[in-house]
UniProtKB/Swiss-Prot annotation:
Protein name, per record: Lipoprotein signal peptidase
BP GO annotations: proteolysis
Catalytic residue positions: 118, 136
EC number, UniProt record: 3.4.23.36
Native source organism of the sequence: Beijerinckia indica subsp. indica (strain ATCC 9039 / DSM 1715 / NCIMB 8712)
Compartment list: Cell inner membrane
Ranges annotated as spanning the membrane: 67-87, 91-111, 127-147
The reaction(s) this protein catalyses: Release of signal peptides from bacterial membrane prolipoproteins. Hydrolyzes -Xaa-Yaa-Zaa-|-(S,diacylglyceryl)Cys-, in which Xaa is hydrophobic (preferably Leu), and Yaa (Ala or Ser) and Zaa (Gly or Ala) have small, neutral side chains
Length: 167
């Protein structure tokens, strides 16, 4: 499978899983009426609308702010898609696909509802992590894969596999 196809499939899969999960939690499971749902002493499913980006940074409280975030997200997706189109390494393509799919999932939320739907909340004692969704997880996984590639690529002194998996 070529890097482009792999990245495209990863983006599609991340987008579909994210949107299906959000639709199911909101419209079928009715998380808004049930929240919070404790799955473990350290993990809850809750329902939050985030008008900003990670950690609620750059909260878009106005319509103009919302559309600026949408435009910046779509521009980033365009740049990442160009990078994916040129990628010759499957790990990089997979990483970019995850980031693109996650970014598209959150962009759809912001366009349709003005904010991103977040559900997953980890906490231990007084420590708590931010509330996130599957799109956020895909973006983080993609960034982690890019970091892995940076440390294992030819530039780092280790031959990277080509599109057939040969070093």
């Amino acid at each position: 499978m070529s890097p482009r196809v792999l990245g495209g499939l990863a983006a599609f899969l991340c987008l579909v899983l994210d949107q299906a999960n959000k639709l199911w939690l909101i419209h079928v499971f009715d998380i808004e009426a049930r929240r919070p749902v404790r799955l473990a002493p350290f993990f809850d499913i809750i329902y939050e609308r985030n008008p900003g980006i990670s950690y609620s940074l750059f909260r878009a409280q106005s319509a103009m702010g919302r559309w600026i975030l949408v435009a910046l997200t779509l521009f980033a997706i365009l740049l990442l898609s160009i990078w994916l189109w040129r990628a010759t390494n499957r790990l990089v393509a997979l990483a970019l696909g995850c980031i693109i799919g996650g970014a598209l999932g959150n962009a759809i939320d912001r366009i349709a509802a003005g904010a991103v739907a977040d559900f997953y909340y980890f906490h231990i004692g007084s420590f708590s992590w931010y509330v996130f969704n599957l799109a956020d997880a895909a973006i983080v996984a993609g960034v982690a894969l890019l970091i892995l590639d940076a440390f294992t690529s030819e530039e780092a002194g280790v031959p990277a596999p080509d599109s057939e998996g040969h070093s």
